[in-house]
Each structure stands twice: as C-alpha cells, then as structure tokens.
A protein has these predicted regions:
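Bacterial N-terminal signal peptides that target proteins for export
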Residues: 3-21
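Low-complexity, polar-biased intrinsically disordered regions enriched in Pro/Ser/Thr/Gly
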Residues: 60-66, 147-148
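Short solvent-exposed beta->alpha transition segments
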Residues: 64-119
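N-terminal low-complexity, Pro/Thr/Ser-rich intrinsically disordered segments
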Residues: 37-49
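Bacterial N-terminal signal peptides
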Residues: 20-30
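Exposed beta-sheet edge and beta->alpha loop/turn motif
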Residues: 114-169
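Short, aromatic-enriched amphipathic alpha-helices that serve as compact interaction elements
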Residues: 46-62, 72, 76
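Sec/Tat signal peptide C-region and signal peptidase I cleavage site
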Residues: 32-36
Length: 169
C-alpha cells in the first residue's frame, strides 16, 4: 500500500514530466497518422488511377493538413519530373502560381485517355475550378523501368500549361 501511495505522490510532484511525455507520444502518433494518409506508388496502380489520386488530393489540398494535396501529387511525380520541378518547396510554389493554381481545390474533373503505348499513357484532363471556370490539360504518365522501389510504377512525367475553356455560368 505504501508503494502505491508513493507512486501517486510522485505523479503529483512531477506533473510536467508526464505532460511532456504524453505530448511527445501524441506527436509521434499524429505524425505517423499523417504519413499513413499519403498514398505511395506501386505497380498495381494503373495510369488513370495515378491521375485520379493526384486530382482527388489537389481537390482538397489542405485536408488533412496544409498542402497535403500538393505533397501527394509530388509522390506520384516521376523522378525526372521531380528533378526539374523540385525540391518539394519549389514544387509547392510552382503549383500555387497562376499557371497551375486552378488545380487547387477544384470542383470536379474529367479524364479521357488519348494515347496509350506499352510504357506511356497520355490523357486529356478537364477541370472545373472553384470559380466555375474550365481548363484543359495534357497529362502524361510513364512506367518507371529502372530498378528500385519505383520499378514498374506509373508516374507523372508531364502536365501541360492549362488551356482555358470558359465558364460554366
């Protein structure tokens, strides 16, 4: 009984240590939860699905955290694309420019395949942005052929500048 009292007494004496401990544990689990929400490339994901993953993420860019959609999109960018558009902070800034900002928090999209070969697929993507304006893009994905964790994964190699298509109003 005396040992049990000492334990509770110790908790009262050192509450700050325990608060710090619980905050630390909470942060660890929160960080892992955010990481778990990022979809990673794998060979089972088809070309169209790559674009759907990217567009769905950009549609809700700041959910569950700031720029989550842009980060998700980055994960499916081909390494050659990342070399040109990265690092990630530069990629975030590029997406937020007038050239691509209409992708952020857009209302809906349509994807039409226009070309397919063994290792390359090209799609015409039409989005309606949050201001009800339509834009069309050419979106190209390629199968990554080099050894490593991305082998046989479909990844985005190019997204054209948008072509304004007018308003829905």
């Amino acid at each position: 009984m005396k040992k049990e009292l000492n334990f509770w007494k110790m908790l009262k004496i050192q509450p700050d240590i325990y608060r710090i401990f619980f905050v630390f544990i909470f942060l660890i689990f929160s960080t892992n939860e955010l990481k778990a929400e990022i979809k990673k490339p794998n060979p089972d994901i088809k070309p169209r699905e790559v674009i759907e993953i990217q567009l769905n993420a950009l549609m809700k860019n700041d959910t569950p955290s700031k720029d989550h959609g842009i980060i998700q999109t980055w994960f499916f960018a081909h390494p050659n694309n990342q070399r040109v558009t990265g690092p990630i902070e530069r990629f975030k800034n590029m997406i937020k420019t007038d050239s691509y900002s209409m992708l952020l928090n857009h209302e809906n999209y349509e994807i039409v395949e226009v070309y397919k070969s063994k290792g390359v697929s090209t799609f015409e993507v039409t989005i309606m942005d949050k201001d009800k304006k339509y834009y069309k893009f050419k979106w190209q994905v390629e199968k990554y052929e080099l050894d490593g964790f991305l082998k046989n994964c479909w990844l985005t190699t190019a997204v054209s500048q948008p072509m304004p298509m007018g308003s829905s109003i």
